[in-house]
Amino acid sequence: ATQNPVESEGVYPLPEAQRDRFLLKVDVPYPRGNEEFEILRRMSVKAPQPTQVLTTDTIIELQDMASDVFVHNLVAEYIVRLVLATRSPGDFDMPDLEPVIQIGCSPRATLGLVAASRALALIHGRDYVLPTDVQAIAKDVMAHRIMLSFDAVADNIAPAQVIDRILAMVPPPTPVWNRQQRETSHQQHRYDASYDN
């Protein structure tokens, strides 16, 4: 689904329960000057024709590969702490966020962070998730799931700012990622949380 930034509420504002079903909300900014020039260059000559890049079978195979990306127990616990911090920020030394967040992230955010972090790790050519993967994708997964208080909205506080604060305050694990430890832990802790829309 797309949302026009000029009409930020969209045609029909979605309630929280429906927004929660979207895995990601990705904000696409205006293109930079060189990017806009490239758009102009491409479209001024002849409209590009779409060509197939991946087959359906390849896409399914990539989805299967992403679901097999290893999530260490420490990384999974880190994901849970990030989500819990949106519900009870006072428990994570952020009492000032208590009046800011009206509704925190649901368990779908936890599942979404695992799924999106796995996909990002795969894009980076890894078969395991790092805390940096979680941090890189956290705002896209969590920001649209947080409902701010009226006072926070009046103060122009954005959900992304809240996520940035949580990422700064909730410490990531210090990992040791050698293959033997991954394989040993992989046998003990397997996270097969699929993201169900």
Which sequence ranges carry the predicted segments?
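Conserved AAA+ ATPase small/helical "lid" subdomain
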Residues: P50-T110
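C-terminal engagement/docking regions of AAA+ P-loop ATPases
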Residues: D91-N197
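Canonical AAA+ ATPase core
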Residues: A1-V69, R118-I123
